Amino acid sequence: MRLSTNILSTTLAGLTLLFACGVSQGADTNKGRQLYATNCAICHGPTGRSVMPGAPNFDRGEGLLRPDFTLLASIRSGKNAMPAFQGILPDRDILDVIAFLRTMH
């Protein structure tokens, strides 16, 4: 019984990790590039090098070590000077931007 519980726990943990990391599968990085240029580059820079103090430098991977669902929540809600994009961009578009960001470094 104990072995079955351990196997089940390990399987559930693995599936949770798999789904958490795989949110952007099938994302459109070209669309993400266009959305980034329109909505993000003014502060984060056209190449990902921040032009606004406090904004992460995506060209160095800053802030991109978090899973997609965490980044999605951050972009939806905004932070400090960054506006919230919930209601402005649909989640699919935000995930396209995240996928594009991951290609920058």
List each language-model region with its residue ranges:
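Electrostatic cytochrome c docking/interface patches
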Residues: L18-L35, T70
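Periplasmic/extracellular electron-transfer cofactor-ligation site
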Residues: A27-N57, K79-A81, T103-H105
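Positively charged n-region of N-terminal signal peptides that target proteins for export
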Residues: M1-N6
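Extracytoplasmic electron-transfer domains, predominantly the class I c-type cytochrome c fold
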Residues: N57-H105
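Bacterial N-terminal signal peptides
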Residues: S9-A20
